[in-house]
């Protein structure tokens, strides 16, 4: 049997998600999370054959130690799994305009990822550390980079050019790039299957809702507009990010209130969104609990979150012309029947009718349509970015 297993690595600034999948069918052999990098309680958790495991990585461990643990402590006891690995696939948040599709990693690709680091300062440097750690531990296996931004490279210039002096784009690449592309690609493709349509003739609006959140208009299988911009800060209200605001607020904070630019950046990225509005938490589950208990801040945060999302969804009918379905995905999108119902009720102009039983059933990994028969379609599709990364890795290695 030919080898089809891919180790997928998703390196964050203080964590590393990993999984080994069969790229042909998405079958997950092992999955895990290494977290708390740089702290005394750095640890790793993984699931193998239905059993959960946890271990300490050692105080102040980080990406390299995590990859070494995967190789020397976990896979050393799984020679069959390790022997069937054909590639290592890496999720890369930002590829700028340099990368319009997935690529096998070489020195030029590493340089390109590094050049894009200013556009994703928390993510791209961590990706590079993870790639180098994987290269050291798996010197004979090809490494593949799969970019979150690549799916959005099909956007027309009217969607990605900001109304700033054009030379800022021409000389410095300042434009909309978008994120979560791998997720939007997967769920839009799965939506076409669920609708029984050819992906090239399917128009959907995908809402990837997690601590980071974005909406994408997908026309005929291609991204034609998306809510995140130059960076992941633009667009929807998120866990700790503000999303859209009047840019003059930055000027006001600096010149009238005495903030430094670094403080403003931290405020908008880490102190705003659901956390900032509610003054309670960035976790949507906590927001929903507060809402149920009548907490004013949580209620306001939830209402603003849903209102902003509904406005974006409505606006994305413009580039589509015809809407076949709204697709909810991501941790919040897949599990919050409350938010889905609120958003669809705000879109009453489109005559969505939520089926309460279907909506409640479509949680915890369950896929399904959540609107009534005869109503315009809204559905939940659990995302699987790891499978897309594994598929692309296998395809490139077999080229």
Swiss-Prot record:
Q: Which Gene Ontology MF annotations are present?
A: acetate kinase activity; ATP binding; magnesium ion binding
Where's the active site on this chain? 148
Cell location: Cytoplasm
Cofactor annotation remark: Mg(2+). Can also accept Mn(2+).
Q: Where is this site: Transition state stabilizer?
A: 180, 241
**Known EC number:** 2.7.2.1
Q: Would you say which domain of life the source belongs to?
A: Bacteria
- Give the catalysed reaction(s), semicolon-separated: acetate + ATP = acetyl phosphate + ADP
Required cofactor(s)? Mg(2+); Mn(2+)
Enumerate the InterPro entries for this protein: Ac/propionate_kinase, Aliphatic_acid_kin_short-chain, Aliphatic_acid_kinase_CS, ATPase_NBD
Q: Where does ATP bind?
A: 17, 208-212, 283-285, 331-335
Where substrate binds, per the record, is at: 91
UniProt pathway = Metabolic intermediate biosynthesis; acetyl-CoA biosynthesis; acetyl-CoA from acetate: step 1/2
Q: Which Cys-Cys disulfides exist here?
A: none
UniProt keywords (A-Z) are: ATP-binding, Cytoplasm, Kinase, Magnesium, Metal-binding, Nucleotide-binding, Transferase
State the oligomer form and interacting partners. Answer: Homodimer.
Job of this protein: Catalyzes the formation of acetyl phosphate from acetate and ATP. Can also catalyze the reverse reaction.
Family, as annotated: Belongs to the acetokinase family.
PANTHER family in UniProt: ACETATE KINASE
Name of this protein: Acetate kinase
Naturally occurring in which organism (per UniProt):
Shewanella amazonensis (strain ATCC BAA-1098 / SB2B)
> Gene symbol?
ackA
